[in-house]
Amino acid sequence: MFVAMNSFKVVHGRQDDFETAWRTRQTYLQDVPGFQRFLLLRGDAAGEYISLSIWESRDAFLAWTQSESFAAGHRQGSLAGVLEGPPNAKLYEAVLVEDAEATARA
């Protein structure tokens, strides 16, 4: 499992605009090989968000970043004036995974 995260700092008062942009955009992720899940997380501190995507593997994620699906998803609307600066990307390989489904199967 591979996780890609982007942290965002949203300009004060523009949180609704930021969330609406994410809710209304076409992600093109559902049919991408290796894609498993996407979450947009709102932090406790005002204006702090994280987008988190979960992939079968690093290779699946990297293939997506070179795909037309990636380009199409990132061509939609600008967040200029909504963000305080560019997002900060972090990439992680899963070391341990525990979830309710795995526990239920045990």
Residue ranges and their predicted role:
Residues V10-H12, S57, E93-L96:
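Non-catalytic surface loops within mature trypsin-like serine protease
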Residues F2-K9, L39-S67:
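Short, well-ordered beta-strand segments in beta-rich or mixed alpha/beta enzyme
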Residues Q26-Q36, I54-K90:
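An amphipathic, aromatic/His-enriched active-site/gating alpha helix that lines ligand/cofactor pockets
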Residues K9-A21:
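Short, surface-exposed ligand-recognition loops at beta-strand->loop->(often short) alpha-helix junctions
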